[in-house]
Amino acid sequence: MNEEKNAIQTVAEKAKKAGKKVGVTTSVSVDHATPAAFYAHQPDRNMYYEIALDLPKANFDFYAGGGFLKPTTTFDNKKAPSIFPIFEEAGYTVARGYNDYKAKSQNAEKMILIQEEGANPSCLPYAIDRKDNDLTLAQITESAIDFLTKGKNKGFFLMVEGGKIDWACHANDAATVF
C-alpha cells in the first residue's frame, strides 16, 4: 500500500496477470511482512488474520512457510472464523508437512504447504535445532518449483525468503547463522 493506503499492484500480481504461475515461500509465517508484501494489501504488517484473508484473493498457485500466526483472531483481537476452511473453499489444498505435500500435490490445483500440526506456526526451526521430520526451506523451495512447473504453463515467479536468517542476525547469534 502507498502512503494514502491505496493498494499497489505487486510484482507477483503482475506475473500472475501475465499468465505465469506464482509462488510465495518463506521460512517464517506465510502472513509475515515479506511474504505478505507480495500478495496482501493491508495497512499494518501486524494484521496477520487480515493478511491471511488476502491470500486467496491474490489467487496465487503456491504458498509455503511455517504456518499462520493468528488463524482465528483479528487485528483487534476478536475471534474470527478459521482461515483454513476459507482457503479450502477458495480451492487450496493445505498440506501439513513434506510427506503430506507429496501425498496431496499431484491432485492439487493450488497448494499451501505449512508445518505439521503442533509445530510452531511462526517459523521453521533453525538448522541447528532441526529434528528429522521438520519441514525445511530446501524442501519448501523444491516443492514450489515442482508444483509450479507441472502441467502447461508460461513460466513462473517464485519468491523464496529465508526470514529466519534475518532473525538470527538481529540476535547476533553467530552459531545459528554459521
Where are these regions (language model features)?
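Surface-exposed loop and adjacent secondary-structure segments within mature catalytic domains
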Residues: 1-7, 12-140, 145
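Active-site His/acidic residue clusters
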Residues: 33-38, 119-131, 152-178
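C-terminal non-catalytic regions of proteins with extracellular/luminal or membrane-system context
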Residues: 5, 17, 138-143, 149-153, ...
